[in-house]
């Protein structure tokens, strides 16, 4: 869920140390096999109600791909700038969502509850590390699992819903690709202006939470 943000962070550190001049970050997500295998299991007459519920989240997954080029600031001085970010973990909850190529088993209720607790800790760290104040951030690009999860984050942090572009209704949960795809769509719509501060937010299985900033 956070692989693209993690990739940006690793690349950013390498660029700052002068180890590389450019970095290409690429993510591709496909859910076709998961759909087929999940539906086959859900048709089994021996499936219990609990097993059925645990399989449901797999059907919210979507397909998508994105790529981003990062460079040292002196090579592209007028480009948007990645300011870095913070990450926090709560690995005691590592069993809430487990998956592989053909199956994902999820406790959606506990994932939401514990994920939001971790997000609150991460947001507090972002305030200290990057001087975040909700009203001073122009857009919030959120890794989107569902309307319930997105609305919970908006409510918890007091975010203006108009600053959160949602794509899950059309694309589903496209995992790590959701953050760069939302960012790209905002650019296409002309919503990103030079100097604007854009927050990138994501909660992933593990549990892990990352928050970062781009200055356009």
What is the meaning of each model-derived region?
Residues 28-50, 84-102, 145-155, 176-181:
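Active-site-adjacent elements of ketosynthase-type condensing enzymes
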Residues 14, 21, 37:
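An acidic, phosphate/nucleotide-engaging active-site surface
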Residues 4-8, 29, 69:
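Alpha-helical metal-binding/catalytic segments enriched in His/Glu/Asp
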Residues 17-23, 55-56, 64-65, 76-78, ...:
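Short coil/turn connectors at secondary-structure junctions
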Residues 44-117, 121, 203, 215-216:
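Condensing-enzyme catalytic core mediating Claisen C-C bond formation in acyl metabolism
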Residues 23-29, 70, 200-204:
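Short beta-strand segments
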Residues 1-16, 116, 120, 138-216:
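Claisen-condensing/thiolase-fold acyl-transfer catalytic domains that form or cleave C-C bonds
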């Amino acid at each position: 869920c956070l692989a693209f943000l993690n990739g940006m962070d690793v690349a950013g550190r390498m660029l700052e140390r002068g180890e590389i001049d450019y970095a290409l970050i690429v993510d591709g997500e496909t859910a076709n096999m998961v759909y087929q295998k999940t539906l086959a299991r859900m048709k089994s007459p021996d499936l219990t109600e609990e097993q059925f519920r645990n399989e449901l989240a797999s059907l919210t997954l979507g397909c998508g791909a994105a790529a981003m080029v990062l460079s040292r600031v002196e090579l592209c001085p007028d480009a948007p700038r990645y300011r870095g970010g913070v990450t926090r973990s709560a690995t005691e909850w590592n069993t809430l969502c487990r998956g592989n190529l053909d199956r994902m088993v999820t406790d959606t209720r506990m994932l939401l509850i514990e994920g939001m607790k971790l997000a609150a800790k991460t947001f507090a760290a972002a305030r200290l590390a990057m001087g975040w104040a909700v009203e001073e951030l122009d857009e919030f690009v959120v890794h989107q699992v569902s309307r319930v999860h997105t609305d919970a984050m908006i409510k918890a942090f007091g975010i203006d819903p108009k600053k959160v572009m949602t794509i899950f209704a059309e694309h589903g949960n496209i995992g790590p690709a959701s953050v760069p795809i939302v960012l790209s769509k905002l650019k296409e719509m002309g919503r990103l202006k030079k100097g604007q501060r854009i927050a990138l937010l994501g909660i992933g299985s593990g549990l892990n939470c990352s928050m970062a900033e781009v200055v356009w």
